[in-house]
Amino acid sequence: MQLFSWPRSHLLEIGDQTWCPAWLHQHEQLVLTQLWNLRTPGWSHGSLAKQACAVFKVHLKDLSSYTVLDICAGAGGPTPVLESELNKGLESEGKGPVQFVLSDLYPHVEEWERISKKQQNVTYIESPVDARAVPRFAASSKKECRIFNICFHHFGDEDAAGILKSAVETADSFM
């Protein structure tokens, strides 16, 4: 059964182009991060990032046992909000925090450093991480959940299939 009657779109961002200057790519990432935190009164039930927290709570029953690896994290996306909101809830329940790790093929280290200084449960991988071949990063005592926040438009069908295959083979869950 096909749910959609149109073909999958492979969209590009200006920042993805080889001719795009790094400063513009970083600015583009910052704007996209702000969109995750945008709340439209009367139209939405909180920001998209806060709404995503509900998905975590429903599908990952023991959040404290996870390390969440944000693939294609850009300038941080929803991860700072996810960390803050989810860990407030865990703390109120007397549970330990869930850890978050930012990664990207083009790491935005300056922004990630700023985030991790404010939020002790957010760390980052300074070297490039190719979403098509991600090794396991979680400690052996932790489960690993990979999150893919509006990033699949960067990939063709073959790469997208490889990314999901990698997540199935080397992580415990993905969203």
Residue ranges and their predicted role:
Residues Y66-F137:
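Class I SAM-dependent methyltransferase SAM/SAH-binding core
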Residues M1-D70, A75-G77:
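Class I SAM-dependent methyltransferase Rossmann-like catalytic core
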Residues F155-T170:
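A short, conserved alpha-helix within the catalytic core of class I
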Residues S173-M175:
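Conserved class I S-adenosyl-L-methionine
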Residues C151:
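Hydrophobic adenine-recognition pocket in adenosine-nucleotide-binding enzymes
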Residues R146-I147:
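A conserved beta-strand element that flanks and buttresses the S-adenosyl-L-methionine
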Residues D62-L63, A138-K142:
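Glycine-rich phosphate-binding loop signature in dinucleotide/nucleotide-binding domains
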Residues K142-K143, T170-A171:
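Short, well-ordered alpha-helix to beta-strand connector turns
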